[in-house]
Each structure stands twice: as structure tokens, then as C-alpha cells.
Amino acid sequence: MSAAPVLIRHYTDPSCPWAFSAERQRLRLLWLYGEQIDWELHMVVLSETVPEDFPPERLSHAYRRLALMYGMPIDWSERVRVAPSIRACRALVATRLRWPEREAAMLRRLRVLNFAGELLDDSDTLEHAAEQAGLPVAELAAWADAPEVEAALREDMVGARSPSPASRAQDSGGLRPPSPDASRSVYPPVTGPEEERRYTCPSYELLRATPPPADWPTAQRVDLPGFRPVEAYEAAIANLAPELTRRPDPASVQEVLAWAGIPLATAEVAAVCDLEQPEVRGELARAAAFEPVGVDGYWSLG
């Protein structure tokens, strides 16, 4: 199987509400370009321990603000504690190394459970996510403790804390000082020592992966750290691979849900359709089943 013309290195973390809110952009790219783009997940690991300076009420306030801003299914009820993300990130890296075809499903299930109120450092949450993602629960738990998994996880973390020169040049919104505390996953970036930076979530490194057409000189790499509108990614892809074809917009919300194969939020369906949320909500109500979470919820075909 030949490589796709474009590779996107996706730096993210299952605990980050900004990354969760940006899933609509990623889904739109998947719809438009499909297998013309390859994706690599890299875990940032926003937190390794429970942050003492970021209490649950502060997390609840941040979740509420983002849920109202972007309409994603985020339950902002106050948690009993702020859960560090390292165990979930380790489980994702373990999945990548042994069951790479289930990595995206595992990330999705961890996000859905986390933003519905579950705790990412709880063994029950990790087991439920693994089961829902079609993974062997006990085997994954044992494999996650392997030295190979820990080494790969630390490699991800080093990469996330070594932003490119191009990303540093854009350091007005996509980088942070690298201290792994939860507050830095939910508030806009701040300034810090130049030598101490890390990617916020999501951050994309987009690379030309195959030789460009002889008569079409293209860019070789475009880095877009931090939360961006989908148009920024489309422009980068056009510069990297102008020969890519774009799939027409979907004809219906049913087409989107059938294509996705997983329950989607209203905002995600709207983004794939290139419409506003009120424009798709009525059609979704007539065509799909709904599971409420926070200010929105998830739609699926019956």
C-alpha cells in the first residue's frame, strides 16, 4: 500500500477540552481527504500527578466555559479530584504499539468517558474505554506496564516538549511552558522562558510524505500549534499537496453518521457538513437517536 501524500503528526491528550472541542476540525479533514492523509498520534501528557494549584472547582469552571463556547458534550459537574492524564496516555501508547488499528477508537472512548464525568486515572475508566474500543482489557493492562511502552510514552513527551522552530515563531497561542499541570490544558497559553516550551493540544505538524508532482513545487512541512480553525489546516494541506481531491459535502446527516461509525456531537456533524449547529439539529432529531451529555450529547443511527 502506497503512502499518503500528507502525514499529520497530531499532538494531543485525552484530558484536554480544547483538543476535544477541536475534533470537529479533524473530522472535517477526514471527510474531505480520507486516505490521502496519514495520521500519527503523539501523547503530550498534560499531567503526571494531581495538581495542587488546580482544584476541581477551577476545572469545572473551565469545562463550563468551553462547553458553552463550542457546544461540545462536556459535563461540567465538579469532579472529586482533578485526574492526571498519564495513565490514559500510557494506555493509548500501549494500544498503538500492539493494536494500532484500535488507537483512534481508544482515544475517542477515553475522551467521551472523561468529559461525561469519569476520571482518567481510574482503572474502571480505562477498562471501560478498552472494552468499548474492542481491546482485550486484561492484556492491555498488563502490556501498559511494559518497559517498551514507557519508553515510547517518554519519547512522545519529549517530542511534545521540543516544538519546531516554525512553531516557536508562532508562539502566541500554541505553546506553553512544559510543567505538566492540568491548568495548562484548559487556559490559553502564557509566556515563559524561551527554552521551556511544549505544544498545547491539539497541535499539528503537517508533512509532505511523497514526492510532489514534477511541475508543482510544494512546501515540505507546515506546523500549526494550538487550536486552529479548519481553514488553516485546509490552507496548509493545499500548500503541501495541491493535487489532493476534496470529497463533496455530505448530502445528509445520516450520511455523516453512517460514515463515522461512532456517535457524534451536534458540533461535529455540523462541521463535517460545513453547516452551523442549528442547521443540522432538526435533521438529526428526525433521523437519529440522542444521548445527552452536558449542553449537547451524541447522535447515532438507530
Regions found by a protein language model. Name each.
Residues 3, 34-36, 287:
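Short, well-ordered coil/turn elements that cap or connect secondary structure elements
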Residues 5, 88, 198-201:
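A structure-centric signal for secondary-structure junctions around beta-strands
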Residues 21-128, 266-269:
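Structural alpha/beta surface segment adjacent to cysteine/selenocysteine redox centers
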